[in-house]
Amino acid sequence: MTEYENSRSRFSYPIRGLILIVLLGASWLSLESATANQAVLPKTIILVRHAEKKIVPPENKDPDLSAAGEKRAQEIARMFSGSGIAAIYATQYKRTQQTVKPLADRLRLPISRVEARKSSDLVEQIRARPAGQTIFVAGHNNTVPEIIGALGGPSLPIIPETEYDNLYILTIQSDGAVKLVTLKYGSSKPASGQSMTKP
């Protein structure tokens, strides 16, 4: 069972309250449907594409974040530092590692590195984590939709190359029901100094 909700509205400070409502609401629904003796909390996965990256020569396959990307990474840390995140995953590239580093530093959590071409390995690790955990994932414009689909969410198109402001909250209930909420955060305008060619 999959339910897909798509909110295209942009949030700044209120988004933290909205995220809290989503997380608490998912927990309440799971507790209500569980038996009195065995209440199982849902698992929540927060996914983003890496932040904006620098324009680099074609031979450089691993660019750093641009100034706009660094700003977005700091915004992620501010938004999610109080969200009860238990684990952080990012691919091996600098742009994904740098996207989650401010958040990892604030929470004093390690960044679990996963191969970009092995999304199935990440999906297995997420499924193996205990119920009730909130997990943060930074991926790429092609891998984020792939991970969402593999976890039981809807089939989504590849994220447009110029979009870095999509935020996905996937909730997996104890009965296997999946709910996806899509939000926008931060700046929506491509900034100078970012690459427009690689995912």
Predicted regions and their residues:
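Bacterial N-terminal signal peptides that target proteins for export
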Residues: 4-19
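Bacterial N-terminal signal peptides
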Residues: 17-28
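Membrane-interface motif at the C-terminal end of an N-terminal transmembrane signal
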Residues: 27-35
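Active-site-proximal alpha-helix that buttresses catalytic centers in soluble enzyme cores
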Residues: 34-131, 144-158, 163-173, 177-199
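Acidic/histidine-rich alpha-helical segments that form the ligand environment
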Residues: 133-135
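Short beta-strand segments
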Residues: 138-140
